[in-house]
Amino acid sequence: MNPLTLVRETTAWVSGLSKHVKINNEALDKECEDFLNKHKIKAHKEIWADNWFHYCDIDIENKESTFTELTAKYILVLDTLNFCFWPDSEFEYHHLARGLKNALIANPKCFDADQLIKVTSETIHQWFGKDLPNTSERVRLIREVGTVLIEYFNGSIKEMILSANNKASVLVDLVTKYFWGFRDSAIYKGKQVFFYKRAQIFVGDLWGAYQGRGLGKFDDIKQLTMFADYRVPQILEELKVIEYSPELKEMIKNKVEIPVGSEMELEIRAVTVHVVEKMRDYFNKGHCELLALEIDWMLWGRGEAMLDKLPPHHRTLTIFY
């Protein structure tokens, strides 16, 4: 079955049963209408390639350049490590992206598969000038990426991407099939629920960096959902689009850890996915066609810009986001 359909359908199911997280449809409609009044057209390229902390060596006017794999290697490592920074209050996504960018500039071969299998905690420290939360898991996941690329794709990320035949759904399926660390699913009320956050964001980042060409060309990019993390629900709650139960709201306010796989955690993530689906449908009806991933990036960027003013986000120790 299409993995992106699984994400969309199972998260909608959880949203319909959710006890701790509800959608405020009136606030949702207001946010969408306000957006439509301000932005009739939104280009995706400004959101990814124009971020100074990202590495991107693509010359979009040069067809050969859109098939070079250095940026793709960077993106795979980036999204392998793109999870759970909150235990370190002084480390955010842009620190991760910039640290990897600097490492790649210093040594363009550092993200080759035969180098990834040798990564240690000392390597991580060298890349960022400090230890990251859960370093041992990050090392394991990076080594897994190198091992899989060597065993199944001749050490070539380009070969892996091209084997998907320009299908985002196929590439997400490949990533979750071969890289166990990307298998982001859980059990809710006895039923498996799928998110595939880091697998999807890997495809979305390729599309953004390569601007939908070469290694970033995906004919079904519209099928990607948003990437369920902790920043987007944080901004949605601030905008009153989602509402937490008193118990959950108090836990988040007091920075109490929400157990991974708990009903509360899964409802936060699933309802967030479903909200973005509803926003996308609203925009499309308003003749402003946006992808779920574009809405995700805009909400995430809005949350990052308001970081000092936002209430706490939920805290869950996980390797998935």
Curated annotation (Swiss-Prot):
The protein's annotated catalytic reaction(s) are: queuosine 5'-phosphate + H2O = queuine + D-ribose 5-phosphate
Q: What superkingdom heads the lineage?
A: Eukaryota
Question: What does the record give as the function of this protein?
Answer: Catalyzes the hydrolysis of queuosine 5'-phosphate, releasing the nucleobase queuine (q). Is required for salvage of queuine from exogenous queuosine (Q) that is imported and then converted to queuosine 5'-phosphate intracellularly.
What else does UniProt say about it?
Eukaryotes lack the canonical genes for de novo biosynthesis of queuosine (Q), present in most bacteria. Therefore, this molecule must be sourced from ingested food and/or the gut microbiota, and metabolized to its corresponding nucleobase, queuine (q), before incorporation into cytoplasmic and mitochondrial tRNAs. Incorporation of q into the anticodon of some tRNAs contributes to translational efficiency and accuracy.
Q: What is this protein called?
A: Queuosine 5'-phosphate N-glycosylase/hydrolase
GO MF entry, a single one: hydrolase activity
Q: What is the lineage of its organism?
A: Eukaryota, Amoebozoa, Evosea, Eumycetozoa, Dictyostelia
Identify the InterPro entries for this entry.
Answer: Q_salvage
- Biological source species: Dictyostelium discoideum (Social amoeba)
Q: Which GO terms describe its biological process?
A: nucleoside salvage; tRNA-guanine transglycosylation
Name the keywords, alphabetized: Hydrolase
In short, the EC number is 3.2.2.-
Q: Which residues are involved in binding queuine?
A: F227, D229, D296
So what family is this one in?
Belongs to the QNG1 protein family.
PANTHER family, per database record: QUEUOSINE 5'-PHOSPHATE N-GLYCOSYLASE_HYDROLASE (PTHR21314:SF0), QUEUOSINE 5'-PHOSPHATE N-GLYCOSYLASE_HYDROLASE-RELATED (PTHR21314)
